[in-house]
């Protein structure tokens, strides 16, 4: 009976038009004289793709983050292309391409990057998509976090802009006419440094909870503010983040760690309420590891030991130190198992039991992969061996340390100990870290290392523009 009621109710839901989500439903064109984007700033291989698509009577534009970054005088990481050609039609035009994806098929076009010694470069080409039906009728019950097959239908540029996450990521650039096409007010929001969800934020976040993480990440990364309604909706929907697939969550964490400002981003997550949802009890444990005098004061996230450790890791990353996902995760978890860093570990339980009891629930909570769980466990187990040395034992260490240093987990364990001791400003621990730093060490494999994106400080390149002719 209840299911029947929902079906009847859905029939009478007021269906919104796409135009209600768009500031400029007909699309505002910002011409060359009123913006500073030039084709010389675009990826030359991306331009080749667009030119070939246009010659074959298709529409094709650059889209998303590359336009946003260029307007902010940043170097885009990727140049994505969007078109009204279907994946099969794109594949026919480019022999050097492959169709990928299950939920929604896109095309990867491959080139050799001359800047990176002929390393393989990928330009992602997607087809304009329609707005999901649940966005238009406001029916949150239709949202399925695993499959959106019925909503992954081809659409128009207008529909594609309306279904994107934030206004700042919804801009198109037509290199043929050198025109920015703006349906959502994204150009104004970039100029005013505002992160604004397109359409109702509650629906957008429930549709894809990763958008909450991205909003919290972009705020410090771009020096933007999250628009009030978009921010409040994160607080209401923060537990939706736990529905995200573990691979996507891992990918987002990796992106955060690569930025070189992970401490600022984690502070942003804390302000939104997402940090406590993702890492329950971590902030409380970190505060407990502060002195009584400091605990008596009003403590911000950035003042906590966990934030200090991340700040040190960020600086090391900027200095091209080799860090990994498991090092960063261990730095976040460290306050939960802080006793392992000190030689006088005296608990009724064994050190293995102590670590597992405190971390296993968090591993399950975050869906951390088994191999990463094992490595983080090894990192913390190794802390006592690293800490149980002194300069007077140096000769003994020289005889025995090499075997320990050759362990696959040693480098990560050592880096966690070193960063922990620096954050604690513990001279004795720092000296012990220096002992272990002498001589060769086995480093993690290249594919496990985090490479910083080295973002430049934000600097706008806007000129004043006028509201011009509409599409």
Predicted features by range, described:
Residues 1-471:
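Catalytic cores of the polymerase beta-like nucleotidyltransferase superfamily
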